[in-house]
């Protein structure tokens, strides 16, 4: 880590990354520091301080020394030294955080208090009004971003990072912005052959980014082909039987070549994947069926054929969360498509039979939070299920406002579950190795350890300066500069060499002589073994100590799973102090 900071601080481009006012503080003349107010207990200390000789960079010119002020200024200007090291500390913090060497600061409370919800829907429904005033876990607001599939784009990376770009037209103004949604509500079809719109690649991108959604992205992708969904209904039909789940008969043609003849007519031919009654043709006889086969050949897609049911009315059973509704739609215009022309819609009672239909279909593709089952009630008195819709189903009837509120509550419930299951940002790794506390240390067998497997600490992927406590740290070559007093260094070496146990050497690349090893391991305990003899430490060491105290190196970013964290932490602080003292010494 220290090598990285040295290269970073010595780079010519480092000046450009310094905070504003950094160079101005260096060029500003040093203001005079007002002395503290004299008191009865400070007369002796003031005399001793004036008698002591300050450092060369702190000594003011004799001619410019003003008379002592009787009282300090209310707001004294900070000195050059404090401004210098304050700016430097901030710059090094930003540099180390960008390199991932220290824990990034937690986001502010204002930025954490909102979760972004992406709603994919047409603009005629304003979902922002539905979520206005709603909160998640009582703390987080919901920021709604609404757009159609055609107005969205995204990029997703394998490490989980992603960004969604939105280009919408609001009141004649084009709005372009990028954001990171936390949840997605999809209320629009992702694929439709009638309008030549295929947005399955966006669904794949959302799944790639791991975005949670309603319904699930897997189910939305599976609903992009109606025959695929009908195959799931066939499985339900085989499980429940025709009495409980009356599924209509259907024939699937992957292409036009097999569309030769059908045993009975009339039939309804559905070409490809379309919505709102598009691509559906009623065929009365064999000749019309051959004509439709030629049309299917031009579309180069699949087709299905099912018997035409002379319907008395249509049935739609919808489920939103735990809410159930059933509707009956009767054609007034006489068209065989009840969604064409005039029709009468009314809500009917929810029976156990209808509830069984929608509950069985809501379990397909891992579960559907929003779905609806469509069926026809023939004039023969029988029901025929022919389609299942997912979360893109249109809301109908007189209770559309209530249905939108049900969807809103369902989204909030899912977001609450997701937020409560979110793990900690930096969980502690399990303890995989333990450092022996006493006794003879066993020599590690390098032949049993795979060379490519990184160790829990101090592996090849970690920055320099984070070696495990079990390895002997090599001495660092520092340029000539201020250092600790010789008496303190010698006393620290002698005391620690007699008390600290002898540690085995690591690999060949980390072995050093015994004296260097003892000095390297003993210097972290130097302030406890023998305090310095000088009454005032070197000013440069004070600066480096202030720099060291300015950093917040947490245990989660360094020395994970270490049984001797204090010693390793002291070694790192010592290295930081020495390196900064040598870098910024006069």
Curated annotation (Swiss-Prot):
Region annotation (Disordered) ranges: 20-84, 421-549
According to its UniProt record, where is this protein located?
A: Synapse
PTM summary from the entry reads:
Phosphorylation at Ser-426 by MAPK1/ERK2 and/or MAPK3/ERK1 may play a role in noradrenaline secretion by sympathetic neurons. Phosphorylation at Ser-10 dissociates synapsins from synaptic vesicles.
Using the UniProt annotation, give all residue ranges assigned to the region (B): 33-113
Region G: list its residue ranges. 422-458
Entry keyword set: Phosphoprotein, Synapse
The record's region (C) falls at 114-421
* Compositionally biased residues, Pro residues: 61-77, 529-538
GO CC annotation: extrinsic component of synaptic vesicle membrane; glutamatergic synapse; plasma membrane; postsynaptic density; Schaffer collateral - CA1 synapse; SNARE complex; synapse; synaptic vesicle
Per UniProt, the ranges with Polar residues bias are: 421-440
Chain positions covered by the region annotation H: 459-537
List every position bearing Phosphoserine: 10, 426
Q: Where is the composition biased (Low complexity)?
A: 40-55, 463-507, 515-528
* Gene3D superfamilies recorded: 3.40.50.20, ATP-grasp fold, A domain (3.30.1490.20), ATP-grasp fold, B domain (3.30.470.20)
Region (E) location: 538-586
GO terms of molecular function: ATP binding; calcium-dependent protein binding; cytoskeletal protein binding; identical protein binding
Major site of localization recorded for this protein = other
Q: Where is this region: A?
A: 1-29
> So which domain of life are we looking at?
Eukaryota
Q: List-wise, which residues carry Phosphothreonine?
A: 422
Q: Which InterPro entries match?
A: ATP_grasp_subdomain_1, PreATP-grasp_dom_sf, Synapsin, Synapsin_ATP-bd_dom, Synapsin_CS, Synapsin_P_site, Synapsin_pre-ATP-grasp_dom
Briefly, what is this protein's role? Neuronal phosphoprotein that coats synaptic vesicles, binds to the cytoskeleton, and is believed to function in the regulation of neurotransmitter release. May play a role in noradrenaline secretion by sympathetic neurons.
Report the family membership: Belongs to the synapsin family.
Domain notes from UniProt = The A region binds phospholipids with a preference for negatively charged species.
Subunit structure and binding partners:
Can form oligomers with SYN1. Interacts with CAPON.
What's the protein name? Synapsin-2
What species does this protein belong to? Rattus norvegicus (Rat)
> What gene does the UniProt entry assign to this protein?
Syn2
